[in-house]
Amino acid sequence: MSGVRNRRSMAVALVVVALTAAASCSSPTASCDRASAIAGQWTYAATRESPVHGTISGSLAITAVNCVDLQGVMDVVETLTTGETRRMAGPVSGTVVDSTLVRFEAELGSGGGSREHFARVIGDSLAGTWVETTGGPSGAGPFSGRRQQ
């Protein structure tokens, strides 16, 4: 009987250690106070550098920040050098990594696919890179934003 109890205790202890290790390895280092720096309305301007060049402009709204998790919506128009123009909009979700670094993914409809963004937030400015991870031909390029007052 004590052998079964010892095995159960050992199994519970291993699960607790594994969960603690996983949580500590995956948790961003941002404090909850600094996480709110990304919340709000932003302009969004990007360049598509591959496979077809183009420009992307519109808005990014970060509407919910729960310590390190963020959510919002992106609404943009992409204009390619081929003359094709398309409006894309969809939900945004991501993580505040530290006091100035954010990572978020925009799930854009109308063939925009999923676009991963990595950016620095400095005051009322946002700048970084994006890459298309699903959807049409893979695209990538720089982007920036300004907080709207």
Q: Model-derived features: where do they sit?
A:
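Charged, amphipathic alpha-helical segments
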Residues: S27-T29, I56-S57, G112-R115
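Edge beta-strand at a domain terminus
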Residues: S31, S59-L60, T85-T100, G123-Q149
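N-terminal glycine/threonine-rich, aromatic-flanked beta-hairpin/loop signature
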Residues: V52-V97
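Tryptophan-anchored aromatic micro-motifs
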Residues: R34-I56, L70, M74, L126-W130, ...
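Sec-dependent bacterial lipoprotein signal peptides
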Residues: M1-S24
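Bacterial Sec-dependent N-terminal signal peptides
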Residues: L19-Q41, Q149
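Short, solvent-exposed aromatic-acidic interface loops
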Residues: R48-S50, V73-T82, R87, L108-G113, ...
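An anionic, turn-rich surface loop/hairpin at beta-sheet edges
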Residues: M88, V92, T100-F118
